[in-house]
Amino acid sequence: MGRTTKVGSAGRFGPRYGLKIRRRVAAVEAKMKQKHICPVCGRKAVRRISTGIWQCQKCGATFAGGAYLPVTPAGKVAKRVTASKA
């Protein structure tokens, strides 16, 4: 319940907020709910526990990341800068 063909999981909002925003919410939620690559073991087994907290189902590594994705664009830049300084 709460799903539609056009907007998937954002169907819970019904006709509210407009189609464009509901499609954007559905896209973000789809990316968030898929499995991501673990930075420790490299397996595609990272799931979101709560806002900004991610855990690997394989090795059990828990780490902080973005609210909707484990690695944010700003985090990638920061990692690249610190790696180049070292």
Curated annotation (Swiss-Prot):
One of its GO terms (cellular component) is ribonucleoprotein complex. It holds the Pfam family Ribosomal_L37ae. Binds 1 zinc ion per subunit. Gene3D superfamilies: 2.20.25.30. Its cofactor is Zn(2+). Keywords: Metal-binding, Ribonucleoprotein, Ribosomal protein, RNA-binding, Zinc, Zinc-finger. The keyword Cytoplasm does not apply. One of its GO terms (biological process) is translation. A zinc finger (C4-type) spans 38-59. GO terms for molecular function: large ribosomal subunit rRNA binding; structural constituent of ribosome; zinc ion binding. The keyword S-adenosyl-L-methionine does not apply. InterPro entries: Ribosomal_eL37/eL43, Ribosomal_eL43, Ribosomal_protein_eL43, Ribosomal_zn-bd. SUPFAM superfamilies: Zn-binding ribosomal proteins. Belongs to the eukaryotic ribosomal protein eL43 family. This is Large ribosomal subunit protein eL43. It comes from Thermococcus onnurineus (strain NA1). The gene is rpl37ae.
